[in-house]
């Protein structure tokens, strides 16, 4: 009977250790959210002003964003990992990122051939929100959950709206609140954790 009690305690301790290890593996310095958020924010605002002032190529900023995005995604997928530790959850999240990238390009393709930009950007915000929801669960980080909700609301607002220039403003606001602000919070938390770890090592 006593051995069974010890086994149960050891099992619970093992599970707890695995959970803590998993949490440690999913730290995020916020740089990715800031980079992507800033690019989308700038592309959206640029497009708004291009439309407002009758610029001949209103999607110039998005074309530039698309080229940079392809390079960043390729780098992210093929860069060597500095950590040898792998987990079931990290493998799943890698496939989620791949699926997100594929959906992103399918939506962009549809904007160019059939759906049109007025609805297409609504679908983009919808897929952004889906990624935020998953990452908020992996990181146990509420601001990304709030960002997901904001982006879903933004996508519905775009579907209700009929003018592309206002779609761009909605996208800019949704991305600022959903990407950039959580990214700044994550970076601040990460810097504090690194400073604390450095102090502990020095002690």
Q: What do the PLM-derived regions correspond to, one by one?
A:
Residues 87-148:
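Membrane-proximal helix-loop-helix units in multi-pass membrane proteins
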């Amino acid at each position: 009977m006593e051995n069974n009690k010890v086994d149960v305690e050891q099992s619970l301790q093992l599970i707890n250790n695995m959970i803590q290890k998993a949490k440690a593996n999913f730290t995020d310095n916020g740089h990715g959210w800031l980079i992507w958020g800033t690019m989308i924010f700038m592309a959206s605002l640029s497009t708004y002003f291009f439309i407002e002032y009758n610029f001949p190529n209103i999607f110039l900023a998005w074309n530039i964003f698309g080229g940079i995005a392809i390079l960043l995604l390729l780098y992210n997928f093929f860069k060597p990992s500095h950590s040898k530790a792998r987990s079931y959850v990290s493998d799943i999240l890698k496939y989620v990122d791949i699926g997100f990238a594929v959906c992103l390009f399918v939506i962009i393709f549809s904007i160019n051939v059939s759906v049109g930009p007025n609805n297409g950007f609504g679908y983009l915000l919808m897929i952004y929100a889906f990624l935020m929801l998953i990452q908020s669960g992996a990181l146990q980080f509420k601001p990304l959950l709030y960002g997901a909700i904001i982006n879903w609301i933004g996508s519905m607002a775009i579907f209700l709206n009929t003018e592309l220039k206002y779609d761009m403003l909605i996208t800019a606001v949704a991305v600022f609140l959903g990407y950039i602000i959580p990214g700044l919070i994550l970076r601040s938390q990460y810097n504090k954790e690194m400073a604390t770890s450095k102090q502990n090592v020095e002690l």
